[in-house]
C-alpha cells in the first residue's frame, strides 16, 4: 500500500504544471527523500514548498498522502482540508473528499 502511495505521489508531482523555481526544487527534494525513506526530510521540503506557494493545492495533496502513509490521521485530515480549500481542480477536490471520508470513518 505504501509503495503504491509513493508511486502515486511521484507521478502526481511529476505531472504538476504549477511548480516553478525554488518551490520546484523543494518538491524534487521531497520526492527524492520519499524514495529513500527519509520521510521527515520529505515533509520538511514540502513545508518549505508550502511557504513559497501557500495556496498550491498540489503541495497539500502530497503532504496528505505522505501523512496517510505514515498513519498520521490528524495531519492528513488537515492537509486534505487545505487541498480542498485551495484546489481549482474538481477532480482533485473529489479525491480529497474521498480520502477525508475514509479518514473520518476511523
Regions found by a protein language model. Name each.
Residues 49, 82-83:
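Canonical positions in the second alpha-helix
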Amino acid at each position: 500500500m505504501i509503495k503504491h502511495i509513493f508511486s502515486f505521489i511521484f507521478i502526481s508531482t511529476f505531472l504538476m504544471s504549477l511548480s516553478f523555481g525554488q518551490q520546484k526544487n523543494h518538491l524534487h527534494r521531497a520526492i527524492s527523500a520519499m524514495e529513500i525513506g527519509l520521510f521527515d526530510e520529505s515533509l520538511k521540503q514540502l513545508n518549505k514548498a508550502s511557504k513559497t506557494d501557500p495556496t498550491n493545492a498540489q503541495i497539500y495533496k502530497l503532504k496528505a498522502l505522505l501523512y496517510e502513509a505514515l498513519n498520521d490521521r490528524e495531519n492528513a485530515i488537515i492537509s486534505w482540508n487545505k487541498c480542498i480549500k485551495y484546489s481549482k481542480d474538481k477532480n482533485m477536490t473529489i479525491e480529497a473528499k474521498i480520502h477525508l471520508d475514509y479518514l473520518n470513518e476511523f
